[in-house]
């Protein structure tokens, strides 16, 4: 029950964040990435620094998002400090997610061109720094993941409650749909 409540809360937070965007570019990003960002909700304990490694569900969702839209991952890292997000995201851990999940993904520095950032902007420099951190990690041997984003690890297995989790997922999706219909 605790996991279902947490997942429901995360879904509501992400939906609220996406509803809060104001200008047209952000509104377009919201529209484009809503479903993909919800698939990443299981990664929040890891990218928030509360879990040693991403879960298998997180890695599966992350892999789907990378295949569908790299831009959405870039948007999430870009907006990590947005107070409307309502959650903390450690950008180093977010950039490390492909390695932690053993997923081939473009370098985080590709976000500079994906998001059309000026090369000399603060945000572009932040993406470049994240890319260097990840390159340095990949050139060293894996160790334990720490809250500060250093080290490495393997995805943690997820215990399943069978149909109970699936029924909560249905409830969460229904709530998301209702909220979307009300506010869109």
From Swiss-Prot:
Q: What happens when the gene is disrupted?
A: Increased susceptibility to penetration of the epidermal cell wall by the non-host mildew fungal agent Blumeria graminis f. sp. hordei (Bgh). Some early aborted seeds and infertile ovules, and increased salt permeability in seeds associated with an increase in unsubstituted fatty acids but a decrease in omega-hydroxy fatty acids in seed coats.
Q: Which organism is it from?
A: Arabidopsis thaliana (Mouse-ear cress)
Q: Where in the cell is it found?
A: Cell membrane
**Taxonomic lineage of the native organism:** Eukaryota, Viridiplantae, Streptophyta, Embryophyta, Tracheophyta
Q: Where is this region: Disordered?
A: 138-158
What membrane topology does the annotation report for this chain?
Lipid-anchor; GPI-anchor
Q: Which cysteines are joined by disulfide bonds?
A: 33-74, 43-58, 59-101, 72-111
**Proregion span(s):** 161-184
The family note in this entry says: Belongs to the plant LTP family.
Q: Gene Ontology cellular component?
A: nucleus; plasma membrane; side of membrane
Q: InterPro entries, per this entry?
A: Bifun_inhib/LTP/seed_sf, Bifunc_inhib/LTP/seed_store, LTSS
Q: Which gene encodes it?
A: LTPG6
Lipidated positions for GPI-anchor amidated serine? 160
Per the entry, what this protein does is: Lipid transfer protein involved in seed and ovule maturation and development, probably by regulating the fatty acids homeostasis during suberin and sporopollenin biosynthesis or deposition. Contributes to pre-invasive defense against some non-host powdery mildew pathogens by preventing the penetration of the epidermal cell wall by the fungal agents (e.g. Blumeria graminis f. sp. hordei (Bgh)).
- The name this protein goes by in its record: Non-specific lipid transfer protein GPI-anchored 6
């Amino acid at each position: 029950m605790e996991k279902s409540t947490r997942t429901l809360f995360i879904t509501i937070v992400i939906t609220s964040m996406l509803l809060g965007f104001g200008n047209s570019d952000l509104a377009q990003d919201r529209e484009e990435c809503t479903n993909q960002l919800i698939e990443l909700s299981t990664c929040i304990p890891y990218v928030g620094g509360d879990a040693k490694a991403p879960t298998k569900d997180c890695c599966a969702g992350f892999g789907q998002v990378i295949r569908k839209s790299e831009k959405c991952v870039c948007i999430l890292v870009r907006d990590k400090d947005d107070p409307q997000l309502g959650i903390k995201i450690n950008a180093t851990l977010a950039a490390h997610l492909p390695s932690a999940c053993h997923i081939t993904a473009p370098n985080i520095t590709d976000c500079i061109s994906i998001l059309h950032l000026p090369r000399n902007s603060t945000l572009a420099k932040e993406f470049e720094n994240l890319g260097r951190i990840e390159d340095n990690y990949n050139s060293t041997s894996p160790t334990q993941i720490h809250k500060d984003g250093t080290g490495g690890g393997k995805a943690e297995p997820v215990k399943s409650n069978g149909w109970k989790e699936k029924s909560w997922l249905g409830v969460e999706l229904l709530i998301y749909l209702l909220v979307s219909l009300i506010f869109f």
